[in-house]
Amino acid sequence: MKPDAVTTIRSIRGNNKRSESRIVFSEVAKLPTSHGEFKVRVVKDARGSEHVIIYKGAIEDTDILDVRIHSECLTGEVFESRRCDCDQQLDWAMDYIESKGTGMVIYLRQEGRGIGLFNKIRAYALQDTGLDTVEANIELGFPSDMRSYEVAGEILHEFGISCINLITNNPRKIDALCNHGISVMRRIPILIEPNEYNRHYLNVKGDKLDHLF
């Protein structure tokens, strides 16, 4: 039941049977933004973490929905840090969805590729000494990327969505969603011009984390 009433990619269905949903949805509210008017809901997962969904259009009537799965970045999205392009990616995705009239952003609270804000700043300090973003994570004892997309898969299933076009430069998200039973029909690339502060960071994401630019 629904919770309320450009490159070709392989389509793979997850093999594991879905268990009963472990997520709880808030009510729906209007969210007027500088990108247009959206609807917003909050989702609480089994661990008590709160994630955000913003969407517009008749998503339940869309055969293949345009979706952006975006991980929290306080430094970029609140303080407009130029060390990354996270805020620009989110802006790009919201503008794209507004232009199409239908789509969804799933905003996951997994700061710093899953290591949290405290450790993200520790990693920044190591990067200031010459390590790259992957090396800094490893130096702190973390994998290069600790993010999970299980909750995103659950959210999509609860909306009755099984086929999407994914707005991303990260092919690992495609594999993760396919493993959770979501068919990714197309990858919609995000085109952001690098700046002097994040150019090396983005190059490392391409070289070591398989991002496509």
Per-segment meaning from a language model:
Residues 1-213:
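Catalytic domains of riboflavin
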